[in-house]
Amino acid sequence: MRISVSRIVGVDRRRLFTWSQDYARRLVWDSFLTDAYLPDGMTADVGVDAFCRSQSGATMVSRYISYRPPQVAAVEMIDGPKVLERFSGSWNFTERTPDTTEVKFTYHFRAQPAWLRWLLEPLIGAFYLVHTRRRLDSFKRWAEAEALPR
């Protein structure tokens, strides 16, 4: 199953991409997470793992499979909630004007067990859709405020 949410953010894409991948700042804006870090002081790049804990207490370790600043960062789950057989996500940053960016969060997942997939995937999809909208709205508010001259 796939869900995707996008917003137009009044900040240039280079800053948005950098801020979105800055784990030291992540919990300031990310309303979905209570913990997020790259182990051993690593910096985001292809092959690097990331640890995240959601507000519900679920944890996921994902691995960067694409990292192309300032355009896209993508990960796939290597360990996570047992209800997910597979999970991957991408955050895309498309310049609309020099100071305006379309930010799109897209997630793909497959639920398990297979015999319950017909029930689980729509429920998980609805959950992720609500939280992804909140998460991206929170990022937009934070980034636009952060970009204001001081």
PLM feature segments, named:
Residues 1-42, 149-150:
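Hydrophobic ligand-binding cavity/cleft-lining segments
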Residues 2-4, 58-62, 85-90:
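Short, surface-exposed coil-to-beta transition loops
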Residues 6-10, 37, 51, 63, ...:
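Generic structural detector for well-ordered beta-strands
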Residues 10-14, 65-70, 92-102, 146:
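A short, structured loop/turn motif at beta-sheet edges
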Residues 16-20, 26, 50, 64, ...:
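Hydrophobic pocket/interface hotspot
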Residues 48-55, 74-80:
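Short beta-strand segments that buttress and anchor functional surface loops
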Residues 60-67, 73-81:
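Helix-adjacent hinge/juxtasegments
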Residues 79-134, 139, 150:
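Beta-strand/loop substructures that line and gate deep hydrophobic ligand-binding cavities in soluble
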